[in-house]
């Protein structure tokens, strides 16, 4: 959200299933709108938010069949789907939908060294708010991993080896 805004995105939309995470996306990271998949129909919400145009750039951080299918449905004409990282099972992509929309797909896992330098510069300048927001002792690793798997961690957890 933050980087998209800094690069000139006029409207950013966070999509997810957890009210707390969507609230964080809006309040902390500047999402203009949110779609809660447990309460709203994705395509209807995106049409309402975008005035029927769809989304120019969809960043899919889940990358599974459901997320890729949903992402291609909400893409605008000539939009770009950016697959970030890898999911568990290979995702099936409907080429007809992409061709009809003249959309494209880009896969990435980290970014280039140049992009990493830009990101570090943005963080140093104070223009980015950190995602790491819960500090833990090393002996809490099992509890933190359990909470992470259960989707109970908002943002990112990190371990401080000097924390007693």
Where are these predicted regions, by residue range?
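Mid-domain Rossmann-like dinucleotide-binding core that forms the NAD(H)/NADP(H) cofactor-binding site
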Residues: 1-40
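Local beta-strand N-terminus motif with an aromatic residue
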Residues: 31, 54-55, 141
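Short amphipathic alpha-helix with an adjacent loop that forms part of the alpha/beta core around
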Residues: 41-52
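A generic alpha-to-beta junction signature in SAM-dependent methyltransferases
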Residues: 50, 62, 74-76
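N-terminal Rossmann-like NAD(P) cofactor-binding module of classical short-chain dehydrogenase/reductase
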Residues: 56-59, 82
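C-terminal hydrophobic helical "lid"/dimerization subdomain
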Residues: 69-70, 77, 113-164
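ADP-ribose/adenylate-binding Rossmann-like module
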Residues: 75-90, 104-108
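Rossmann-fold NAD(P)-binding glycine/threonine-rich loop
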Residues: 85-101, 113-120
